[in-house]
Amino acid sequence: GVDVESGTGKTGGLEISIRGMPASYTLILIDGVRQGGSSDVTPNGFSAMNTGFMPPLAAIERIEVIRGPMSTLYGSDAMGGVVNIITRKNADKWLSSVNAGLNLQESNKWGNSSQFNFWSSGPLVDDSVSLQVRGSTQQRQGSSVTSLSDTAATRIPYPTESQNYNLGARLDWKASEQDVLWFDMDTTRQRYDNRDGQLGSLTGGYDRTLRYERNKISAGYDHTFTFGTWKSYLNWNETENKGRELVRNVLKRDKWGLAGQLRELKESNLILNSLLLTPLGESHLVTVGGEYQSSSMKDGVVLASTGETFRQKSWSVFAE
């Protein structure tokens, strides 16, 4: 099955797991494009940061879920399955939605939370150019509860005050009945309070404030043939986890003087994907295509020891 729940991670965010596998093995796509960064950027219980960029509900047309391994097509991070969120596009008139919510707890030991999101989409040039803008914010108060029972773990969901922001826009150009070009930008900012060491010890590698930042730019081209559809896109995204610090026990002796300095955790990915979708009979679909990825990651622990930046380039061709 598919589980969407707030786990016992340090941020209290939502995680999606499929068929009992950890959330790190569920790949999240929006309009077929990868969104989150590697779990190596969010180590030690911060993986839920990668799900803080979902579009507003009004922007979603449908959600496609593939349960089971899709590693051949998407890589090892799709061993559990794939969730593809399809957004609304090419509206023939302007549509807008604004939503606000407030969750009030009965006990003042639990933090209240509020949400606000908006979405608007419509034509700029009739039957040719359309624009979509979207955004959301979530504010959560801290919780003074540290344990649910005498035997429970000290860490629980919703442990600390946080502010999450997401803003994005998409431009579609229908050049002809068969050709569509699109451009999409998205930015996410998350902030978590750690003044009392709720997320990690202030003397053990954590700053007083932890932040997660993600920027994404995508451009694509879709062409419709009589026998199928050709889809291509170029996607660049950069994610950074700020607020971690270097500690002596992970540094070489001659690097102990760096203890207490900020630990850089930053990743960037460039992905070029192109595929052809064509029906086979009345109930089958054939997918043929290829993908190229260029990735780099910086970890302050490795940088302090060797100065090395991890880099990887890979390509693949596939048929399904």
Located regions from the model:
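Extracytoplasmic beta-strand/coil segments of soluble accessory domains associated
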Residues: G1-G37, E61-R62
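Transmembrane beta-barrel architecture of outer-membrane proteins
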Residues: G13, A78-G80, G101, S113-N117, ...
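Short acidic/polar hinge/loop motifs at secondary-structure boundaries
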Residues: S17, V33-R67, F118
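Extracytoplasmic loops and strand-loop junctions of Gram-negative outer membrane beta-barrel proteins
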Residues: N44-A48, V65-I66, N99-N103, S149-R155, ...
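Outer-membrane beta-barrel pore domains and translocons
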Residues: G68, I86, N99-Q105, R134-Q138, ...
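Transmembrane beta-barrel wall of Gram-negative outer-membrane proteins
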Residues: K109-Q141, S147-R191, E213-G220, P279-S283
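Face-selective signature of the C-terminal outer-membrane beta-barrel domain
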Residues: D172-Q190, L210-E320
